[in-house]
């Protein structure tokens, strides 16, 4: 879990790109053939390849951090200026912003305190878990490439236990409206469809500065892995491209058995430690 803080959207975005790209998501090429290349040419080729992938991931991070920040700011503004907010207004804001995203496949608003909402009598039943204990608006985008295709997902009983939500609730500071939380890659399942994803989120507060919920966005790593692992981008025979975090936990790897394992689990060579240190730095 990473938390990014700033005093402005511009600075936040800068921090997100520099820290998350460097620490959470970075390309590591761990083997290559240099039979017909000089060492310098090989390093240049690898550098260019890495930059291409970093730029691609940077664009995704740019969008998700900006989107999370913008919607959280709007929601916090609504709750700060009103004791009760129309649930239809909130739904419209979240759906419209979500539809503009090219990468997020899910968005959600979790509220532990629903007294800030008006007209709860007519609320969509999908927003309330079967046991009646959890309120969340969860939306799925079936076609991220174009507008439309947004559907509502029924809130599961255990949704409040989502790792991102738990981490934000446990670590958020009173009235902190600037921190964006980025979860580690993990298996997620909102509607009986398990996938590997990453969550972005921010805390939501009422007009007294009390934490009342989380707005979040989820990206599916499948599309990212298809781009990163596309064989047409191979520079050398036997090269390996990996997406991992600063603990060496692998999110993308051509060997599916290596997913969510550490680099040390699949590579006992001393070079693995050097790669993880490079990611941290």
Residue ranges and their predicted role:
Residues 63-177, 228-232:
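Extracytoplasmic/periplasmic sensory segments of membrane signal-transduction proteins
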Residues 141-226:
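Extracytoplasmic/periplasmic ligand-binding sensor regions of membrane-associated signaling proteins
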């Amino acid at each position: 879990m990473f938390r990014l803080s700033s005093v402005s959207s511009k600075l936040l975005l800068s921090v997100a790109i520099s820290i998350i790209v460097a620490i959470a998501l970075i390309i590591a090429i761990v083997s290559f053939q240099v039979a017909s290349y000089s060492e310098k040419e090989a390093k240049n080729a690898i550098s260019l390849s890495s930059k291409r992938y970093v730029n691609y991931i940077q664009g995704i991070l740019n969008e998700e951090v900006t989107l999370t920040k913008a919607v959280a700011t709007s929601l916090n503004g609504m709750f700060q200026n009103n004791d009760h907010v129309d649930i239809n207004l909130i739904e419209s804001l979240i759906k419209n912003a979500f539809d503009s995203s090219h990468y997020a496949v899910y968005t959600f608003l979790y509220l532990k305190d629903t007294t800030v909402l008006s007209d709860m009598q007519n609320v969509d039943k999908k927003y309330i878990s079967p046991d009646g204990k959890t309120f969340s608006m969860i939306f799925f985008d079936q076609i991220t490439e174009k507008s439309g295709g947004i559907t509502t997902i029924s809130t599961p009983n255990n949704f409040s236990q989502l790792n991102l939500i738990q981490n934000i609730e446990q670590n958020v500071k009173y009235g902190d409206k600037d921190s964006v939380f980025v979860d580690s890659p993990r298996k997620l399942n909102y509607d009986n469809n398990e996938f590997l994803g990453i969550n972005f989120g921010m805390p939501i507060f009422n007009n007294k500065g009390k934490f009342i919920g989380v707005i979040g966005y989820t990206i599916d790593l499948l599309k990212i892995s298809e781009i990163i692992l596309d064989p047409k981008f191979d520079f050398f025979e036997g090269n390996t491209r990996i997406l991992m975090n600063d603990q060496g936990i692998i999110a993308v790897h051509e060997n599916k058995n290596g997913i969510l394992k550490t680099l040390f689990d699949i590579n006992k060579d001393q070079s693995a430690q050097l790669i993880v240190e490079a990611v941290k730095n």
